[in-house]
Structure formats: structure tokens, C-alpha cells
Amino acid sequence: MGKGDTSETASATPAYRSVMEEYGYEVGKIIGHGSYGTVYEAYYTKQKVMVAVKIISKKKASEDYLNKFLPREIQVMKVLRHKYLINFYQAIETTSRVYIILELAQGGDVLEWIQRYGACAETLAGKWFSQMALGIAYLHSKGIVHRDLKLENLLLDKRENVKISDFGFAKMVPSSQPVHSSPSYRQMNSLSHLSQTYCGSFAYACPEILLGLPYNPFLSDTWSMGVILYTLVVARLPFDDTNLKKLLRETQKEVTFPANLTISQECKNLILQLLRQSTKRATILDVLRDPWMLKFQPEQPSNEIRLLEAMYQPTSSAKRHQSLEITT
């Protein structure tokens, strides 16, 4: 437990700033808000770099968040190092707050970009989608699922490269429980890792989540990737999420594309592979090998592919047909 930071008066330096200064951080402007805290830009004087500081109020946060989701988020982020993921640097806990020091992405997020400029050219969509796919391949190869992929969680650095953020719902799948599928990687209904409680936004949720069924979190991630790719090239979500029943009906049908937009058939095919029922839905391995994806990412991540192939090996064991229900 760190030092206390509860004393705060109108005339004094805010307590969170004093705590940050003790650790060498000069806190700047607010760059984001969450349910339980605020994200600030900060300057780390010891290494002369800009960072992001997520400050979580223990008073505002629920016990479930403080005791389960926040420790899990920190645990997951500590083991991750990838150029398309927001990197974790440090966590500091005091009597009233938790401070998480993260890599700073200075270009805003992809949702803001779409709202400002509209649909992406397919070349830009391909760049951002392939970067996201490489980040997710890295996660999945480590047995980690994100479970909250959405446009606002795709941050942009100063060169407009994607950085996947917000690991608050991420989860490590136990390595002792290998993932099984058919050799085609498509019979994923037999996968051994099912989550029971939904995490994330309904607009990006796969049909099995909307139906309240246990779901495969690896495949829920790839469904969300399909929603993201569609929105990149169309500038609107593929399904109307204003009404849950309507949303569920729409996700049961094949997604359609506006006639007035020029979208390549290869791009459409990938979207259709992602936005389909779980037994036929593309895995991250399928995405890496997709013809449209390969146009933008010809160099394959060999280490991740090797690990993913090992995860998806078929098995003759009866365990293949069993489901292990895991808690959130």
C-alpha cells in the first residue's frame, strides 16, 4: 500500500498531483474519462517522456471492480509487450486511489476519426485492421482475450498507428486447458473455454452473447473485429443497437453493404467471415491468412501463428466435446 492521498483542500495542490510528483510525474491535461476515474497526460521527469495516467477513485469504484477486474487488468497488462498494444509501465496504490501509468497515444481514437472524417479509404482501413489483427493474434497466442474491442478502444499514436487499449475486461484462459477445434479451425463450437457473463458494448456483441448463452471469448473478439472493419469502411455500425430485440434479429442475418460505397469483394468477404454464427466464424488464424488481410500485412507473425496452431490442434479425446464454463 502506498502513501495516503486523502488530504485535499481548495488552496493546496490536489492530492493526486502530489502523489504523482513524488514518483516523478508532472500531471497535465485531462484526456479521457471512465466510470471510476480520469485519464491524464503526464510528463515522466526521470525518463523525459510523456505518458498517460489513469487515476481510479476507490470511493467511486465498485468492490467488484476493485477486487476482481482492476487486479486482473493490471495482471494481464504486465505480461504484454507489443507495438500495437498500449503498454503498461507502473501501478501505484494509495489509501484512496489507484494510479496506472500507461503508454500515451497522442492521436485520439479511431471512433473520433470516423466521426470527423467518415468512412476510411480501404487502404487506411486495411492498415488499421491489420495492426489490430496482429495485436489480437499476439493476445490470443498467449491465451488472453480482450472482450471489449470497439472503435473507441483503438487509440492512435502520432503516426496514426493503432494501439489497442482498455484491458479492463481482458482475461487469461488457463494454459492447462488447451483450445480444440477441427483441422479447418472452423468447428469452434467444441472449444473448451466459455465465458458466462458478458463484457463490452452490445453494438459489438456476437449473437450468442445477445442470446444470453455461454460464449467462446476468442470468437467474440473476432466478431467484434468484424463490426470494427465494417464500420471503418462504411462509417456506421452494421447493426442497429438502439433496441436489443432488433439487434438480435439483425445479427442472425447476413450483413448488407450500402450500394453507394465502393468496397472490394475481398474486404466484404472477410467481414462476412467474421460476422457469422460461431460454428463458421473466422478465428484470428483465419484472419491472418485472409487474402484481403495479406495485402496489408504480407509478413506473417510466425511465432504467434505457431502458438495459435498448437492451440487449435484437433484432438481424438472425448474432451473435445466438453465445455468448460469459466467465471468472468
Swiss-Prot record:
Enzyme class of the recorded protein, top EC level: transferase
UniProt-listed GO biological process terms: fertilization; flagellated sperm motility; peptidyl-serine phosphorylation; peptidyl-threonine autophosphorylation; positive regulation of CREB transcription factor activity; protein phosphorylation; spermatid development
Coiled-coil regions listed: none
Record: residues binding ATP: I31, G32, H33, G34, S35, Y36, G37, T38, V39, K54
Activity-regulation annotation: Activated by autophosphorylation on Thr-197.
Source organism superkingdom: Eukaryota
This protein's UniProt keywords: ATP-binding, Cell projection, Cilium, Cytoplasmic vesicle, Developmental protein, Differentiation, Flagellum, Kinase, Magnesium, Metal-binding, Nucleotide-binding, Phosphoprotein, Serine/threonine-protein kinase, Spermatogenesis, Transferase, Ubl conjugation
Span of domain Protein kinase: 25-293
GO CC annotations on file: acrosomal vesicle; motile cilium; sperm flagellum
Cofactor(s) for this UniProt protein: Mg(2+)
Post-translational modification: Activated by autophosphorylation on Thr-197. ODF2 potentiates the autophosphorylation activity of TSSK4 at Thr-197. Ubiquitinated; HSP90 activity negatively regulates ubiquitination and degradation.
CDD domains per UniProt: STKc_TSSK4-like
Catalytic function, reaction form: L-seryl-[protein] + ATP = O-phospho-L-seryl-[protein] + ADP + H(+); L-threonyl-[protein] + ATP = O-phospho-L-threonyl-[protein] + ADP + H(+)
Compartment(s) of residence: Cytoplasmic vesicle, Secretory vesicle, Acrosome; Cell projection, Cilium, Flagellum
Effect of disrupting the coding gene: Male mice are subfertile due to reduced sperm motility. The reduced motility is due to morphological defects in the sperm flagellum at the midpiece-principal piece junction caused by the disordered arrangement of doublet microtubules and outer dense fibers.
Active-site residues per Swiss-Prot or TrEMBL entry: D148
EC number: 2.7.11.1
PANTHER family in the record: MAP/MICROTUBULE AFFINITY-REGULATING KINASE, SERINE_THREONINE-PROTEIN KINASE MARK2
Family of the protein in this entry: Belongs to the protein kinase superfamily. CAMK Ser/Thr protein kinase family.
Self-association and partners: Homodimer. Interacts with HSP90; this interaction stabilizes and activates TSSK4. Interacts with ODF2 (via C-terminus); this interaction promotes ODF2 phosphorylation on 'Ser-95'. May interact with CREM. Interacts with CREB1; this interaction facilitates CREB1 phosphorylation on 'Ser-133'. Interacts with QRICH2.
The protein's name: Testis-specific serine/threonine-protein kinase 4
Organism of this sequence: Mus musculus
